[in-house]
Amino acid sequence: MKVLNLYFSATGNTEKVAMRISEAVQELGCEVDTLKVTGKDLEIDILNYNFVFAGSGVYAQLPGTPLIELFKELMQKYRKAGEVKPTSPRRPSAYAVVYCTYGGAHTGINEAIPAVKYMGQLFDHLGYTIMAEWYTVGEYKTEKLRGHSVAGRLGDIRGRPNEEDLRDIAARVKGMLQI
């Protein structure tokens, strides 16, 4: 099984999750390409992969701008190539997990849901079966927002994602790849 682990991380929270995903995939003996989206040109053909993990932090209820731009480019590329078809028929042996890290200071997980749904649409349009949507709490790291890590709706989220969160991610990865 060929696995792609594609992510954007501005503060390091999503990168922690992405690295744990990569480790767990490798422990299962699968090949994995882990790629950080940076906003620079990234040549990737998602259709070369049987299983894709795609993640981002949540910024104003959406994935990071570099990931949004990449997904727009990919959607356009696949439309032109005729890979996006009416009714989005499922591709055999094509699976995806979309995930995010979020602080949820104002409305909790509801702030993160639009970001994950947005990311999932690329894969759904390409006929991938979306196996799961993962939401991992992550602390606010910028000086301006750091206070939200203790005063937000989710309570004290300092230090998250922590080792317990990352162990949970690894267990989920191992469960997903046993398809």
Placement of each model-derived feature along the sequence:
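Short active-site-proximal "capping" loops at secondary-structure junctions
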Residues: G39-D41, Y59-A60
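Aromatic-flanked redox-active Cys/Sec active sites in thiol-based oxidoreductases
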Residues: Y7-T11
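Short amphipathic alpha-helix with an adjacent loop that forms part of the alpha/beta core around
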Residues: D41-L47
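FMN-binding flavodoxin-like domain, especially the glycine-rich phosphate-binding loop
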Residues: V3, N13-K16, A24-D33, L47-I179
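Short loop/edge segments at beta-strand edges and connector loops
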Residues: K36
